[in-house]
């Protein structure tokens, strides 16, 4: 082994020291040292670059390899001390020349920062005068090619709360023969194992032995006049020279490029004339010179000289770099922002969010709690936690690791969510059972079940999207088979669920898409409808959706009612209480949905396809109004087109076809042939409603489920006349909730269609194939009221998303899903929006493999940075974005997508060539590629890059100006592959710089428009959403993306996949597809029958079906959005973003493996808004805007092996099919501003936000110290004042009334003494303190402040007492304490302070108004906490209370008393958290105390909790 000497130089800048909350005044000093593993022979040299600034108490100094900072004195609270000490550490080491780069990348460079202190006399010469009080060790992850350039804030421990900001730059500066001797540790044996450590210096080798190898010996030539070199030694020399020169040149290139980037991005940075070097040419030149030398001595000298020259160049560049960037404030700010974003992103992993209908908050959800523990166990059994990549500068005490990072579950209860798609996860065993079924269908099932409806893009990590399954791609070819298997899966899951529940409870279960059993406490229970009814509904619904949903995109197809999503029987829906509407949404929607209503196309196209109205879902309004009987909606649809406000589920007004029950199959109806008329083409500016509205022959809304076989013939489509726009509009006008505030007027044939405002509650969330929820795209979800469309007839706002989803979904799934989707669609609008955002990013990076053998080759997912750098090229990763579900394959085998550069004129032609069920839609998006180039463009990086760019910048001026996208898609097959041919025209005023700069690439809309009739035209936009148009709409937030959850053909899934087959004319494709569709329909029918049996049992999972993807005409804010929409069909853009017309950064969805689709270095302006213009959670207007410069793929700078391992782990996680979504897929998190980055503005006129922190039993005012610290750090610049209550700390065993009086006096006195102008008041309570806070709210003296209440953060608060605590040990201890202390508070907690339970303190407190005055009610509990029962902390029903015949009713009444006002208040947002801490095996953990206090003293939990989600509650 030949060893070479390497030198890595580190520049460590200590910028500022912040006194966060130090207890003692005195002198402080920071000492830094560098360490590397002793197994590597090394020497460390330390020096100070130059003394700068004031010397403070004493100047900085160097002691051997230890550097001491300036010694400074701390006297005041929140004091900041400028250090500006620049320390240089030169690490010289011996490395194996064969493994130089690998060794450097894997080496642990450890930077130790020690805080020393003294409060006495101090002399700079005496190092021992200062005592060590706290220490942090930073692990520096160095790359020989990129170096290291990072900034971190290092916080010392809880007892010495202070922060030092550190900037680190590092580079490889030298590689050459060993010039000095290095001490080598002597290996110890068992004989001398106790001997003191010994070192011996290494021998300095000769130059020849280094260059030619250790065994080299000189050999004379035969003539004796010269020396000769054996070939082996000569090859060693060449390899040695090449390796070292290449490493040095790459290090030079990396440092040079970073230097250039810094000088360009920071205007004030000194500009230097840096020498450009062609690395490859220089390397080739050096190698050629060496090969010309024959004399061994000359060869060794030349190699040594070349290395010396390169080292000198590198050292000179490093010196220039340090001279320019050292202590550069703007660079420090830039690096701080980057580190903060990466850190928050890392925290967002394993932070799950579930969205539920608002009414579900009162439901009994024991299964949810159990599933959280099962999910944690399953996650820890995977490699996900252990493979979590570290940050570039890592501190495990601050950033967490496998043994310290908690897993957090968030439950949101949103008006926009009408169906509980996030069913409890019943464990791996269920998954394994369903594994027998095809992944494709399973994925769709999961996605629909999980229904990512988060304001943020929901990428269902576990289960969500088909794209995660590499196996799915292989299965695409077996799509038909997969469908049946998947249906089996869902049945298995449902069956398992049923088994887990007791029969008595099952009766109470509301049939939900989510599969989870929910018992509504105090609400009327739904009766399970007969299986026949359910089946009928499903069958009927499919037909509607197909009919109308197809409209623009559906040319013709046969579909069987079975293909439609199952719907609960109309009876069932009618039985539902209005309050339960959301919970049940699924069934009601189904019922309400007539064949046309469920049509995702109709609803989705809402303006686009009036036909697609989803009666059930659309009707749902943001307010709590429930879906009324579907039958009523159906009827109302026809009869009351004008009923805008109708709170009943808006029915789109689609005609229904009456289908008689089939004699053959009890679950299906007779086949009916429906011919759709051609759609009329509207002006580009107008939304083509005609296209959206297919002409259906008679539809009867008798509520009977019927299967309709719709055969679309190419000629029929072209020739048939479409219904008048008015009729279609009438269909659309389902009764929509009045709530929508803003409306888009879409002119269709002179008629206006209003899209529902975001206020509408129906936001549909779906899993896109990529695993991202598509829900964000739903109109209802869109926060921007502007995006809302009103149906012309005064129908309520319709969710175009809902209308479109089916079309968007894979055809097979579409049919089924169309109904099911509607059911599942309702999810929070916010989440939907976010999902769409995420999906956008993922689109470019997501590569899909078509099931076709043609598309077998996998596309390498790459995200291109703006600088055209590929962030990650992990090699080919197969992501079957299409669920590979053959069903859902709206398969356009040869579909290709071409994006044109300009949104305004761009037309997207969707041509489906041969749509085989097997083949998922594949889309190639490139600005430059023509249809002929499509194939290559999929894999080509430039195309991906351009695509990414286009998608990323959804029009920086996300003007609300809508673009009308006209899709004249001639063929859409529901239930089977859909072929869409047509063009999408988008009118957008938005200027799209980057995304679509090439007009030539895309056909003009007019051209496409004219070409639409001839599908054979060459450019195919192949938007897999059936159609990009719909996707685009979703992007805008006008329409919910249905494809997301259930359609495996989501664009995002299919994008980047190209078919090798040539495109075929529409005629051929339509005919072929029709036949294929019929075949698939038959198979789907079988599946439907099975599914319907499940429906009969009351456990139907809509997730099994994907809604059909449809083309949607919508106004798009920007063309980028359109493109993003298509690409990220699965991921939905946050409606908020769209709504606000904000530019949205592309976000990678899980489907894209977290590859940032947006160039990492190009910041995208993003406004943090949720569904509506209000923050998704806080409902407060979002005012935070910032540059989202960091890529979602926070781990992109990690070594490639680590990235691959982590991505593989994420895929494993996806296979678990976990419900909900992870915050890591959300584009914007709660914290975007680095610590200490904003100066506080004293001149603010808004007043002070007073946050009152109240401790618990036997606590003190310092208990919530860390909570206060992380809120202050996370919200720099805000006018926040903390009152750390101390009035009760001397006696927390008193009764609550006396403690309430003390706290109230303390608050009022604090405000008066400091003359505070209070604009907001928030409360944070721990344990018992939460009840004191609630009691204060009921006092007359506090009445004046009720209108200022903002957020109530309850940390493990016993709101329902300790009545049903499962820990006998804790119960005994509390009983003893109550007797010993004669504690009134403990007696009141057990509800034994009065003989009449309704006269106890807790019951009477629950009857008093209070919580609903807050904008946010945040309840944090933990299943590991045995001091306070989990259900009491989260105010929810527990299993024990249900069985208790005596106190159980009281318990239920308390829950209703507390939550009913909260749920009825539109301004009050309810969120619950379950924290699973990584606790050590100690006595505290055993008795449950560790988890109870972890919410106070776990820095990692608090930082993760606030940075990712909770800070927004205090903004």
From Swiss-Prot:
Q: Which GO terms describe its biological process?
A: lipid metabolic process
- Annotated InterPro entries: AB_hydrolase_fold, DUF3657, DUF676_lipase-like, Lipase-like
Polar residues composition-biased segments: 569-580
- UniProt region (Disordered), positions on chain: 569-592, 1062-1093
Highest taxon of source? Eukaryota
| Tissue and organ expression note | Ubiquitous.
Compositionally biased tracts (Acidic residues): 1082-1091
UniProt lists the family membership as follows:
Belongs to the FAM135 family.
Q: Which PANTHER family match?
A: LIPASE ROG1-RELATED-RELATED (PTHR12482), PROTEIN FAM135A (PTHR12482:SF40)
Q: What is this protein called?
A: Protein FAM135A
Q: Look up and give the organism this protein is from.
A: Homo sapiens
> What is this protein's gene name?
FAM135A
